[in-house]
From Swiss-Prot:
AMP binds at residues 358, 394, 399, 418, 504, 510. Belongs to the 5'-nucleotidase family. SUPFAM superfamilies: 5'-nucleotidase (syn. UDP-sugar hydrolase), C-terminal domain, Metallo-dependent phosphatases. Its EC number is 3.6.1.5. GO terms for cellular component: extracellular region; plasma membrane. Facilitates hematophagy by inhibiting ADP-dependent platelet aggregation in the host. Cleaves adenosine triphosphate (ATP) and adenosine diphosphate (ADP) to adenosine monophosphate (AMP) and inorganic phosphate. Shows potential for antithrombotic activity. Can induce basophil activation. May reduce probing time by facilitating the speed of locating blood. This is Apyrase. One of its GO terms (biological process) is AMP catabolic process.
Length: 554
């Protein structure tokens, strides 16, 4: 039976109906093609075990997909089937499940070393446990680490642990791999005294050096800056680069009908960007959470011009066999994780979904922010009904949906893995309004995507994102705190409001510097998972829905 399953899976990998291919106009007069197969993953986020189709914890009654054992099966098979294959990892291997909370860098390095990549860049989440949490990983990982835009002059422990690029040889040709990380990593993680340099200029400089000094034939950028920024990078990094293997934005790219999973298609696979010189640069990305492995073959002419390409992401559905060695290696870790993770916290009679969190209020966002407010209502002994009536949550901190049924400790950690504290502070209405404006100002060439959206409790917001930045809040109403009967009143820029939120946001994460720089009477609270556990038990069975707290005109 196993042999039959493997045979069917191999057929799925090579059937042309699932492969997108296209010619690229070529000025190369050579007749011989050089194929370069690139197998790639990104944003693994500690999904060692199989998940449900949305990347959350898989329950016995659900359809399970992905997981590291299937990922290894697929990567090995694609490497064997490809031509001059390279395997690239576009970062954010850290953070996302109880596996990481308990095993940290140790478990990540252990399993990544069972399937070393030819190159790996670093992502923002690799710095979530500060410099001390990444240096040990860099010291033991068997994969070359490439990042071109880090200045480590003030972090001596980081020196010598990575390079700007690496040169691989395949079929007699030299392939340069240049790494790049998001320039705002210091705003969204904890990288100590590292400085992050301009992404485009850093890639341009290193790619030029590779072409001129190392005499490489092909340059691939291994990027963890997000699809929007990859568009800009492809346009502006010069004709030194040929393709970008991306991550960070969890973008599912697909060409054609009938994508295999439940992911929303963001753009084509690959995206084609035409530079002003006429050169085409390709961009690929493979969603997130070990549900897909990217697979593309680039065909170059004798003069190293891109002629054509073929490929598509491979979906790791339940038909993909798991590598027995990996399954066996995981058992000891699973026992350790499951002992804590299988504890039942509460019951939910609704799906707690993050799907719409960037474009409206979502019920999981309502659950988070209501939990934050509830934390302080229950311990309050003073006048009025609460010491804090407004709860805020950055959507990037909500990491997974949860299906209806029992909620375990492991699922809750997967929802909120970052171990923030739930803190309170005073903020003027003026700066609160600035925060609401910042939540909808991130540009996106595919249309508004709410990258920095805030989920809220005790707030009613109407946005018009067709208006100019800084003028998009049409209406903002705040639930009163110092009142006998809670009601919503227009936000007053001169009023002072008591706010509760995660420490990440309170300290200016995601660019919310107006909160960091203007908060008063700051008090640190309990860990977020303790707050969420307490509220889940209080609310069980959970029935929260979408309540129209946020409305967006676009």
């Amino acid at each position: 039976m196993f042999k039959i399953t493997v045979f069917i899976y191999v057929l799925q990998l090579i059937l042309p109906s699932k492969v997108h291919s296209s010619p690229v106009p070529d000025s190369d007069n050579g007749l011989r093609e050089f194929p370069l197969s690139i197998v790639h993953i990104n944003d693994f986020h500690a999904r060692f075990e199989q998940t449900d189709e949305l990347g959350g914890q898989c329950k016995p009654t659900a359809k399970c997909v992905g997981g590291y054992a299937r990922l290894v099966t697929t990567v090995k098979k694609l490497k064997e089937e490809g031509q001059n294959t390279i395997f690239l990892n576009a970062a954010d291997n850290y953070q996302g499940t109880l596996w990481y909370n308990l095993g940290k860098w140790n478990v990540t390095a252990y399993f990544m070393n069972l399937l070393p990549a030819d190159a790996m860049t670093l992502g923002n989440h690799e710095f979530d446990d500060k410099i001390e949490g990444i240096v040990p990983f860099l010291e033991v990982i068997k994969t070359p680490i490439v990042v071109a835009n880090i200045d480590d002059s003030l972090e001596p422990t980081f020196k010598g642990k990575y390079t700007k690029s690496v040169v691989l040889e395949r079929g007699g040709r030299k392939i340069g791999i240049v790494g790049v990380i998001a320039q705002n990593t210091d705003n969204i993680s904890s990288p100590g005294k590292l400085r992050f340099l301009d992404e485009i200029q850093s890639v341009k400089n290193e790619s030029k050096r590779l072409r001129e000094e190392e005499k490489v034939d092909i340059v691939i950028v291994l990027s963890h800056i997000g699809l929007d920024h990859d568009y800009d990078l492809a346009e502006q990094a010069g004709d030194y680069i040929d393709a970008i293997i991306g991550g960070h934005s969890h973008s599912f790219l697909w060409t054609g009908d009938n994508p295999p999973g439940k992911e929303k298609v963001v753009d084509a696979y690959p995206v084609e960007i035409v530079q002003t010189s006429g050169k085409k640069v390709l961009i690929v990305q493979a969603s997130a959470f070990a549900r897909y492995v990217g697979n593309i073959t680039l065909y170059f002419g004798e003069n190293n011009n891109l002629i054509r390409y073929a490929g598509a992401p491979v979906y790791l559905d339940s038909d993909v066999p798991e590598v027995p060695q990996i399954v066996e290696e995981m058992k000891a870790w699973e026992e350790f994780v499951h002992e804590k993770g299988n504890e039942i916290i509460a019951e939910s009679r609704v799906v707690l979904s993050r799907e719409n969190c960037r474009v409206s209020d979502c019920n999981i966002g309502n659950f988070f922010t209501d939990a934050y407010v509830h934390e302080y209502v229950t311990s309050h002994t003073g006048p009025y009904w609460t010491p804090v009536s407004v709860g805020l949550m950055n959507v990037g901190g909500i990491r997974a949906s949860v299906d209806r049924g029992n909620i375990t400790f492991s699922q809750l950690i997967t929802m909120a893995p970052f171990e923030n504290t739930v803190d309170t502070f005073d903020l003027s209405g003026k700066h609160l309004l600035e925060a609401f404006e910042h939540a909808v100002t991130v540009p996106n060439r595919l249309g508004f995507n709410g990258q920095n959206m805030l989920q809220v409790s005790g707030v009613k917001l109407v946005y018009d994102v067709t208006k100019c930045e800084g003028q998009r809040v049409v209406s903002a109403k705040i639930r009163c705190q110092k009142c006998d009967i809670p009601k919503y009143e227009p936000l007053d820029p001169e009023e002072t409001y008591r706010i509760v939120t995660a420490s990440f946001l309170a300290n200016g994460g995601d660019g919310f510097t107006m909160i960091r720089d203007n908060k008063k009477n700051y008090k640190v609270g309990r860990k977020d998972y303790d707050v969420l556990i307490n509220y889940a038990k209080y609310s069980s069975p959970i029935t929260i829905g979408e309540e129209g707290r946020i409305r967006i005109i676009q």
